[in-house]
From Swiss-Prot:
Disulfide bonds: none annotated. PROSITE patterns: HOMEOBOX_1, HOMEOBOX_2. Residues 1-32, 157-183 are annotated as: Disordered. The keyword Transcription applies. Transcription activator that may act as growth regulators in response to water deficit. Interacts with the core sequence 5'-CAATTATTA-3' of promoters in response to ABA and in an ABI1-dependent manner. Involved in the negative regulation of the ABA signaling pathway. It comes from the Eukaryota. Changing S67A: Reduced interaction with ABI1. One of its GO terms (cellular component) is nucleus. The lineage of its organism: Eukaryota, Viridiplantae, Streptophyta, Embryophyta, Tracheophyta. Residues 119-154 are annotated as: Leucine-zipper. Interacts with ABI1. The gene is ATHB-6. Residues 59-118 bind DNA. Induction: By water deficit, by abscisic acid (ABA) and by salt stress. Self expression regulation. This is Homeobox-leucine zipper protein ATHB-6. It comes from Arabidopsis thaliana (Mouse-ear cress).
């Protein structure tokens, strides 16, 4: 009996304790409703975070599932063609034992890496070209600056010594022009004034009186007063001696030859042949002969203008 009572007492005690615990758990008012709800919400959020972490780990584990052989096969297919078509995607997935989505993602990532590598290569090539062009540009600019400095120096030299050179050139030009003008005058004077005749004028050797033609030729020889004056200034003494010698020879002989009469220019000589007979000794006196060959006055031969008198 005692055992039964003890057992009943223990069971009763347990029964009495159980509802109390259940009532404590079921009565949230004892700890406050708001605090309990906040605790529950925090617990749920922690569980969701743990699930998400486990999901990420599972994805990473799925990514790591590609073997080395699968990667090599995908690389070969990528080298053949980097674009993936749907039929090809399914075929590769079946051959490699992967999902089509995994194959598509791998190709997408591989294309991105390939583009970045290509951009890096292109950037390196362009950078080298830019550096070379920059170097060439700098060298050309330095050369240009040096050439400009040389040009400025040459300009200063030309401007500094240009006056003396111009003066020398002007003086040389003036001297050459003067020499040319003098030569032209020397050449033009003999051509305009006198020309050397091919043969002396023809005179009548045998005649009883003075030859009219000799006087006309003599008149033509001295047409200009200026020529006579210049001739007198140049050779006055020589002509006077020639005229005196001519008069002396006339008195000694019947046939006389006059001294050469020179005209300015030095290239023309005219000989006048005169013949005088005894009947005309008084016709030409000494004064008239001197006046005829005089250098101071031009000849005035008005007395032989009538043709009938001499004929």
């Amino acid at each position: 009996m005692m055992k039964r009572l003890s057992s009943s007492d223990s069971v009763g005690g347990l029964i009495s304790l159980c509802p109390t615990t259940s009532t404590d758990e079921q009565s949230p008012r004892r700890y406050g409703g708001r605090e309990f709800q906040s605790m529950l919400e925090g617990y749920e959020e922690e569980e969701e975070a743990i699930v998400e972490e486990r999901g990420h780990v599972g994805l990473s584990e799925k990514k790591r599932r590609l073997s080395i052989n699968q990667v090599k096969a995908l690389e070969k297919n990528f080298e053949l063609e980097n674009k993936l078509e749907p039929e090809r995607k399914v075929k590769l997935a079946q051959e490699l034992g992967l999902q089509p989505r995994q194959v598509a993602v791998w190709f997408q990532n591989r294309r991105a890496r390939w583009k970045t590598k290509q951009l890096e290569k292109d950037y390196g090539v362009l950078k080298t070209q830019y550096d070379s062009l920059r170097h060439n540009f700098d060298s050309l600019r330095r050369d240009n600056e040096s050439l400009l400095q040389e040009i400025s120096k040459l300009k200063t030299k030309l401007n500094g010594g240009g006056g003396e050179e111009e003066e020398e050139e002007n003086n040389a030009a003036v001297t050459t022009e003067s020499d040319i003008s003098v030569k032209e005058e020397e050449v033009s004077l003999p051509e305009k004034i006198t020309e050397a005749p091919s043969s002396p004028p023809q005179f009548l050797e045998h005649s009883d009186g003075l030859n009219y033609r000799s006087f006309t030729d003599l008149r033509d020889l001295l047409p200009l007063k200026a020529a006579a004056s210049s001739f007198a200034a140049a050779a006055g003494s020589s002509d006077s001696s020639d005229s005196s010698a001519l008069l002396n020879e006339e008195s000694s002989s019947n046939v006389t030859v006059a001294a050469p009469v020179t005209v300015p220019g030095g290239n023309f000589f005219q000989f006048v042949k005169m013949e005088q007979t005894e009947d005309h000794e008084d016709f030409l006196s000494g004064e008239e002969a001197c006046e005829f060959f005089s250098d101071e006055q031009p000849p005035s031969l008005h007395w032989y203008s009538t043709v009938d008198h001499w004929n």
